[in-house]
Amino acid sequence: MLICIINPNTTKNMTERIETVANKVASNGTTIVATNPKNGPESIEGYYDEVFCIPGILEEVFSNKEADAYIIGCFDDTGLDAVRTVTNKPVLGIGDSSYHIASCLAGTFSVITTLDVSIPILKNNLLKRGFD
């Protein structure tokens, strides 16, 4: 199985670390490839940055069509819904996945962020997925 993790920002160092760690925990027979857009913000800090990330994220999906699944490597799930519209393969967001796992483990859960600008995105993501 080949899983492509897309880091929506352009920080190559972060992308390399994601790939290294993911391959260390991957099951036998699973290969992880991490990639990031060539152009866009170095950091995603709100809806403004998200707008500039999505074209590059989609480009990475089209460049990695051999992947069996995609993971959006950003807790804001930047571009998650857009990627799901261009492929029939599984697409997971690390934020979305975390919410679902947390809801299975506890009756209630909290999301903690270090950036005030992320709060509206995270709230919206939770509401879209049926969490309030």
Language-model-detected regions and their locations in the chain:
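Glycine/small-residue-rich loop that forms an oxyanion/phosphate-binding "nest" at active or ligand-binding sites
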Residues: 54-107, 111
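N-terminal glycine-rich anion-binding loop in soluble enzyme alpha/beta folds
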Residues: 1-55, 114-132
